[in-house]
């Protein structure tokens, strides 16, 4: 068996223990929160799902984590509306998990603001690390196979309600998040910020 085959086998194995799955899930949340905090601090761009909270955080007296929590709660409400009777009440667990995730973002932002980011190469390096951490966080969240955050849950609900493939819905959803963020930025600030 080649090394690549061993890695594929390892990553495709389900995690059997609930406690271990929760640890992996929270590791994913921590990685994603660090990613959001890093990308916000560099000022070079955010992930599509974080664009709206990042832009709004320059306009309203709320933290990035608080805005993220509010937006994700709205996403959960939309999931319930789209799925109607197919909405599983266990999905309400997304609320406390999102609260913890939002809290992580707010706790990591002050740390990220202390990192050296005076020059473009430093900013670029931190932003690339942020992209890697985001990918790692999403991987760990999926690997935990426990619960998704509302940002992914809403896309799953849209795909199911529209009877469209998830990848197409994800691209359309992410694109719409960026477009809305750009509009908010130009209308509210007069220039591009947080996208």
Each model region followed by its residue ranges:
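Core subunits and conserved enzymes of cellular information-processing
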Residues: 1-195
